[in-house]
């Protein structure tokens, strides 16, 4: 009864609104992130250039309604191959094994479909001949030329990929028992063991797993209703420490999901400021986002107000 509980959280809203362990928010201590950590200010910056988000990495928007999701995934894999190869040939002092993360759905049957698209592509590349191989190489050359604007570099990138395409591994990270048999998670996350490493998954990958050398992310997992800030703030931890590769990172995502995710962090910033400046914590929600799940709120402890807020020019 005389003990003191000290907790650490990345999602203070849920802790506070849930009244977890009779939380005393006036005693909170706020820690600064590590200097190498790339967080909300890097991936979801407030700054814009006209109507475009002013990001310092490669942000590739998809249409909300896809008529050919398999092609979108293949194109993203092509760009990943080109991007990682470009770094290994023309930037890095030594070869690095880069990871691409594919997160399209929480449903495990969809992970099987994503794996088939990925398997087929790499299997056809590994054959090093035939019409399918040539079609892949043509697409890869086009992406390489667009990226480098240099025909010789584009040809070298294609040659490297054609030679090394068999140095790949594809893993599905979910709760399916068959996928866990003999599966070494570190090889697909913290310590990628193959030149081209593809990690596919659902909830498991967004629960605090660290992905080192993550250079590409294909994210199309939307939400049916409102996006929960606590869930998507936690999910963003997979971005993590990008180091010197940060500006070469590519996020492929639908524009609507990105904007919802951006709104989560924008409202979180405002709420965080109220807490950090010794004001009574106010956890803000938007028209398409909510702070936490309604079931997580201790209604005897929390007052909910609804209305509109206006601001003068800042």
Residue ranges and their predicted role:
Residues 1-90, 99:
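Conserved P-loop NTPase catalytic core
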Residues 53-138, 142, 239-249, 253-314:
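C-terminal helicase lobe and adjacent C-terminal extensions/tails of nucleic-acid helicase motors
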Residues 93-197:
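Conserved C-terminal RecA-like helicase domain
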Residues 8-12, 34, 104-106, 200-204, ...:
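A short beta-strand-to-loop transition that corresponds to the Sensor-1 phosphate-sensing loop
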Residues 178-259:
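Conserved RecA-like P-loop NTPase helicase motor core
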Residues 2-3, 24-28, 97, 212-215, ...:
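Short glycine-/polar-rich loops that comprise or flank the Walker A/P-loop
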Residues 15-17, 39-42, 110-112, 181, ...:
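Short helix/loop capping segments that flank catalytic or ligand/cofactor-binding pockets
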Residues 18-31, 44-50, 114-122, 215-218, ...:
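Short secondary-structure boundary/capping segments
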């Amino acid at each position: 009864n005389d003990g003191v509980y000290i907790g650490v959280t990345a999602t203070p809203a849920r802790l506070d609104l849930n009244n977890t362990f009779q939380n005393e928010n006036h005693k909170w201590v706020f820690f600064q992130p590590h200097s190498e950590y790339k967080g909300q200010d890097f991936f979801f910056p407030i700054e814009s250039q006209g109507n475009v988000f002013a990001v310092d990495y490669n942000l590739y928007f998809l249409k909300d309604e896809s008529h050919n999701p398999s092609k979108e995934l293949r194109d993203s894999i092509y760009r990943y191959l080109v991007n990682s190869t470009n770094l290994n040939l023309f930037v890095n002092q030594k070869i690095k094994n880069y990871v691409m993360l594919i997160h399209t759905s929480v449903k495990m049957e969809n992970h099987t479909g994503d794996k088939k698209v990925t398997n087929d592509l790499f299997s056809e590349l590994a054959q090093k001949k035939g019409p399918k191989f040539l079609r892949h190489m043509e697409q890869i050359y086009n992406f390489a030329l667009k990226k480098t604007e240099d025909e010789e570099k584009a040809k070298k990138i294609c040659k490297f990929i054609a030679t090394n395409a068999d140095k790949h591994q594809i893993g599905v990270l979910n709760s399916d028992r068959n996928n866990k048999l003999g599966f070494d998670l570190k090889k697909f996350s913290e310590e990628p063991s193959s030149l081209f490493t593809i990690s596919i998954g659902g909830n498991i990958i967004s629960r605090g797993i660290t992905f080192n050398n993550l250079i590409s992310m294909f994210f199309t997992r939307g939400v049916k209703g409102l996006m929960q800030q606590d869930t998507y703030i936690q999910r963003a931890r997979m971005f993590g420490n990008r180091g010197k590769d940060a500006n070469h990172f590519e996020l492929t995502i639908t524009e609507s999901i990105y904007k919802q995710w951006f709104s989560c962090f924008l409202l979180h910033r405002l709420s965080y400021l109220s807490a950090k400046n010794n004001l009574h914590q106010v956890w803000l929600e938007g028209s398409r986002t909510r702070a936490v799940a309604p079931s997580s709120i201790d209604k005897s402890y929390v007052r909910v107000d609804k209305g509109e807020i206006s601001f003068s020019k800042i």
